[in-house]
C-alpha cells in the first residue's frame, strides 16, 4: 500500500477572525508523527502578529480530534538513542507550550477521540469544547510509554 505524501497533515482555513487548524491524517484517526508539530507551530507563529486573527480553533478532520502518536511510526523509533527521542519529542512539547502560552485564545474543538498526545494538545488550549461523542484517554500506558515522552 502506498502512502500519499501530497496530503497536508494540517488543514488551515479562516472563518472571519478565527483561524481553524485541523489535524488531517486520513485513515489514521488523525494520528500524529514527529513532523506534524512543525506545520502547526508555523501556522500559530504566523497567526501571532496577525491583528486580523482574534482566536484559533484546533480540531481534527473527519470527525475525530487525534488518536495520539502514530503507532506505526513509533515502532520504527524504538532504536533511537534517548537524545534522538528527545529531539523528536521536543517539537511536540514545544507545540504544547506554544498552545498554552499563545497570546490569543486557543479553543480545542473535540469530536470523536482525543488520546495520548492528542489529549495533551487539547489540554494545552485555553478552552476545550467537547462534542457529545467525545472521548478522552491518556493511552500512553497501553503502548508502553510514559505521558508526553
Residue ranges and their predicted role:
Residues 21, 58, 70, 121-123:
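Hydrophobic/aromatic residues within transmembrane alpha-helices
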Residues 31-34, 67, 76, 142:
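Phosphate-coordinating loops and pocket residues in cytosolic domains that bind phosphorylated ligands
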Residues 60-97, 114:
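Glycine- (often His-adjacent) and acidic-residue-rich active-site loop
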Residues 95-145:
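Glycine-rich beta-to-alpha active-site loop
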